[in-house]
Amino acid sequence: MENRYSVHPEQVKRFTTEELRSHFLMDSLFTENKLTMYYSHEDRVVIGGAAPGQSELKLDAGDFLKTDFFLERREIGIINVGQPGAVRVGDDEYVLQTKDFLYIGMGNQDVSFSSLNGEKAKFYFVSACAHKSYPTQKAALSELTPDRLGDDAASNVRSLYKVIHQDGIKSCQLMMGITMLDQNNNWNTMPAHVHDRRMEAYLYLDLEKDSKVFHFMGQPDETRHLVVGNEQAVLSPAWSIHSGAGTSNYSFVWAMAGENYTFTDMDLIPMDGLK
């Protein structure tokens, strides 16, 4: 597990491109037969990827968390961004097709990931601290109804799927979902916003090899950008905007954790407030 320490926005103003990338970009989440994890000191979230091959991968952080097992004091949200796979929780197995979600509550000791029938599943997960155990629950993308947002003039027509949240799958503090941009649309989260009460992470998906997303971050009057490829994720501190424009349309998995559990709790930034 790799540590990602919190950084003050005054320090970020002076970062080079490589410093920005080393603190905020997670560019190697999916290595076959490996569990990859990043521990962010922004609201103590763990962000990771599991790419099981012929054998199961167990959700295990060794002694990093100083607990007897990973979910002893944590909850976790999982999405399969690869081919069909399964997540075993104790004696129960949950088959996840592409872009299906699974929430697992605090206290579940044995969790493992596997691919099915020679396929190559890829599981992306975000874990946050928890104080109560909520039931394990699966959400199939095919059974969800998205919010349709945006317009052609702003090049941001998209489908927003809220999965783990106050009015969906219940959790302690974790919120998670996916946004999918229509073809010929490339902007997300613009006009921008911040939410000083919680952090956020974006995993960018459905990009061709030569396509990129320019992810905008930083304080509204001190913006910076990261060039992000397919299946790469970005950490967004509470003080930072999080927006992007792609060279093609794309999808992104968003996840939040922190003080407030209300999805609409955000501070909008007017366009003339960006620099």
Curated annotation (Swiss-Prot):
Cofactor notes: Binds 1 zinc ion per subunit.
Pathway linked to the protein: Glycan metabolism; pectin degradation; 2-dehydro-3-deoxy-D-gluconate from pectin: step 4/5
Catalytic reaction annotation: 5-dehydro-4-deoxy-D-glucuronate = 3-deoxy-D-glycero-2,5-hexodiulosonate
Binding site residues for Zn(2+): H193, H195, E200, H242
UniProt xrefs under InterPro entries: KduI, KduI/IolB_isomerase, KduI_N, RmlC-like_jellyroll, RmlC_Cupin_sf
Stored SUPFAM superfamilies: RmlC-like cupins (SSF51182)
Matching NCBIfam families: PRK00924.1 (NF002091)
Entry protein name: 4-deoxy-L-threo-5-hexosulose-uronate ketol-isomerase
Organism whose genome encodes this protein: Bacillus subtilis (strain 168)
Gene: kduI
